[in-house]
């Protein structure tokens, strides 16, 4: 899709990119096909799309003979959605806030995949929503801010809170980087496609999720500090308790939070008494 074609489409529907919703329309449709390929879409699949906008990804999906449920918050795209619904019996939509929509009830009993170009400002919340959903998707293939994508797919040495919160439940991999000039209007930062595959069976045994995330938040609030300092200062633990616990787990007290593996965090959570 050329910039001229996109502008004509926007003009025909009287649409304007909404800065409040962080709308940037992708012009390079080969990226859309790459996302569909990465998700291993096959005929009959149920696809959940968030933020269909002008419907270019939606139409590509429907060409693959899948069922698509699109969630759109911005009412200006209603004419586009109505046109798609009129032309495709396998397409349905909800005009609502994705962060408040009950996907688990709507898709109860139906396996589904999420494929979407999501606004930067809700990226983290959307990903977390599906990690903790009662009815989780098989996978998520998302176009998002490059920095966030690489944070999610981080490895020990550069781990962070969102990486751990996703990788406890799924495997994540950055597929490709999409430069800002591929969008209209062009965002100030580059984007990336990330593919997240949910674990079919739990990979990790989490005994107390609330406790685990209390520890993680406390430690990553000072991630440049050494682990023993964050545990002592942010969780009000005595130096003796911290020293003995880390020694028992054979964790270097001088290590920084981003260097720990998920297994080490889980062991630490099991040992600490808060």
Region annotations inferred by a language model:
Residues 198, 218-274:
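C-terminal lobe and adjacent flexible extensions of AdoMet/dcAdoMet transferase-like proteins
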Residues 1-218, 247, 258, 274:
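Catalytic cores of RNA-modifying enzymes
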């Amino acid at each position: 899709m050329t910039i001229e074609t996109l502008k004509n489409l926007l003009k025909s529907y009287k649409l304007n990119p909404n800065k409040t919703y962080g709308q940037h329309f992708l012009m390079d449709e080969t990226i859309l096909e790459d996302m569909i390929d990465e998700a291993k879409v096959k005929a009959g699949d149920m696809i959940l799309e968030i933020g269909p906008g002008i419907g270019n990804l939606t139409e590509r999906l429907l060409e693959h003979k899948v069922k698509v449920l699109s969630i759109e918050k911005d009412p200006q795209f209603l004419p586009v959605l109505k046109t798609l619904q009129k032309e495709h019996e396998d397409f349905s939509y909800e005009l609502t806030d994705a962060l408040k929509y009950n996907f688990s009830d709507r898709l109860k009993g139906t396996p589904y995949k999420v494929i979407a170009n999501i606004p930067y400002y809700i990226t983290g919340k959307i990903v977390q929503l599906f990690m903790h959903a009662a009815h989780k998707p098989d996978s998520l293939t998302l176009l998002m801010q490059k920095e966030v994508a690489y944070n999610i797919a981080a490895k020990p040495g550069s781990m962070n809170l969102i990486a751990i919160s996703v990788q406890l439940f799924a495997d994540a991999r950055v597929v490709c980087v999409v430069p800002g000039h591929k969008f209209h209007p062009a965002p100030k930062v580059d984007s990336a496609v990330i593919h997240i595959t949910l674990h079919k069976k739990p990979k990790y045994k989490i005994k107390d999720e609330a406790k685990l995330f209390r520890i993680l938040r406390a430690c990553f609030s000072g991630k440049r500090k050494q682990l023993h300092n964050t545990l002592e200062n942010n969780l009000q633990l005595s130096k003796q308790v911290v020293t003995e616990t880390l020694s028992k787990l054979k964790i270097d007290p001088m290590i920084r939070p981003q260097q720990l593996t998920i297994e080490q965090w889980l062991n630490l959570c099991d040992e600490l008494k808060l």
